[in-house]
């Protein structure tokens, strides 16, 4: 069931989203060669809690981190640990914060130092595909209009959209209806209504679209070992379009 939020609920979710965005700003300052993903996790957890929120991911189905930290060929759900970031890596950081009972959720892929032109293009195309999807997020549109816009931008540029992981509704639960694929034909699915809150999060591979899960039962990697990127915002559908909630 898709739950439309009241204005009171949206006010809380704006603050949850703001805390997520501020945490991303803080983390970005520390993403540099030599830091471990565990240290980034500690910085994020401290920052989230200092703003009166709790990490959405910590303890979620047994997940041990406060953030997901996925490096290079790791797509999503990377467990923070002793991996040391190196010059030329890329790292996808997924952050969730729960504030007064409601969640905000946003992911971003960052360069570690100087990266190759190829990797920068992957990041640029994935980020732009997110915003191409958001352009379709408006009352009266169909859910899959977002999906189609993302795929139509990324795949003609030589990249592959991951099928197994999708966007989702957000609210008092981190993952709510509806599920939102990042591929497919337009004009399908439920009509968008004001008050819907959605996390749109294209995951794009430089090689094939196929992924697998490592033996830790969390970390998802590309089958061919090529790099991948992940960009996500939580948005609210409004009468006139959409509002990004995960912004500072």
From Swiss-Prot:
Any Gene Ontology CC annotation: cytosol
UniProt keyword list: Aminopeptidase, Hydrolase, Metal-binding, Protease
One Pfam family linked to the record: Peptidase_M24
Binding, a divalent metal cation 2: 105, 168, 201, 232
GO molecular function: initiator methionyl aminopeptidase activity; metal ion binding; metalloaminopeptidase activity
Presence of the UniProt keyword Ion transport in the record: no
InterPro entries: Creatinase/aminopeptidase-like (IPR036005), Pept_M24 (IPR000994), Pept_M24_MAP (IPR001714), Pept_M24A_MAP1 (IPR002467)
Cofactor(s) it depends on: Co(2+); Zn(2+); Mn(2+); Fe(2+)
Residues engaged in binding a divalent metal cation 1: 94, 105, 232
Its EC number(s): 3.4.11.18
Catalyzed reactions: Release of N-terminal amino acids, preferentially methionine, from peptides and arylamides
Domain of life: Bacteria
Cofactor annotation remark: Binds 2 divalent metal cations per subunit. Has a high-affinity and a low affinity metal-binding site. The true nature of the physiological cofactor is under debate. The enzyme is active with cobalt, zinc, manganese or divalent iron ions. Most likely, methionine aminopeptidases function as mononuclear Fe(2+)-metalloproteases under physiological conditions, and the catalytically relevant metal-binding site has been assigned to the histidine-containing high-affinity site.
Residues annotated as binding substrate: 77, 175
Biological processes per GO annotation: proteolysis
Database matches in HAMAP family: MetAP_1 (MF_01974)
Family: Belongs to the peptidase M24A family. Methionine aminopeptidase type 1 subfamily.
Main function: Removes the N-terminal methionine from nascent proteins. The N-terminal methionine is often cleaved when the second residue in the primary sequence is small and uncharged (Met-Ala-, Cys, Gly, Pro, Ser, Thr, or Val). Requires deformylation of the N(alpha)-formylated initiator methionine before it can be hydrolyzed.
Subunit organization: Monomer.
Full protein name: Methionine aminopeptidase
